[in-house]
Amino acid sequence: MNSSCEKIFGVLRSPRVSEKSSRLQEISNVYVFEVSSDATKIDVKNAVERLFDVKVGVVRVLNVKGKSKSFRNRGGSRSGWRKAYVRLIDGQSIDVASSV
């Protein structure tokens, strides 16, 4: 693999499939991805455009805080992660299930 492919797969970790993401995908053409913690909006936009051959309109990125959990009276927490909402230009779509 060349370095550009490694960078793309380093930025996009996986698509997030949930009820909310499915609803956003159907209604407003928005796709949700888990991305690396140091990825910027520009990195995410370039990675999605190159990997799926689509045009991206808007990218919104947010950090999800890890949940506090306890097990047998011992405290701990899950790791936090970063999520990106990617809106495509009208008329374009991604088949997330078969592409990644």
Swiss-Prot record:
Superkingdom of this protein's organism: Bacteria
Keywords: Ribonucleoprotein, Ribosomal protein, RNA-binding, rRNA-binding
One GO cellular component term: ribonucleoprotein complex
Gene3D superfamilies associated with the record: 3.30.70.330
Annotated GO biological process: translation
InterPro entries: Nucleotide-bd_a/b_plait_sf, Ribosomal_uL23-like, Ribosomal_uL23/eL15/eS24_sf
Entry GO MF terms: rRNA binding; structural constituent of ribosome
Intrachain disulfide bonds: none
Family the entry assigns: Belongs to the universal ribosomal protein uL23 family.
PANTHER family (alphabetical): 60S RIBOSOMAL PROTEIN L23A (PTHR11620)
Stored HAMAP family: Ribosomal_uL23_B
Subunit structure: Part of the 50S ribosomal subunit. Contacts protein L29, and trigger factor when it is bound to the ribosome.
Known role: One of the early assembly proteins it binds 23S rRNA. One of the proteins that surrounds the polypeptide exit tunnel on the outside of the ribosome. Forms the main docking site for trigger factor binding to the ribosome.
UniProt name for this protein: Large ribosomal subunit protein uL23
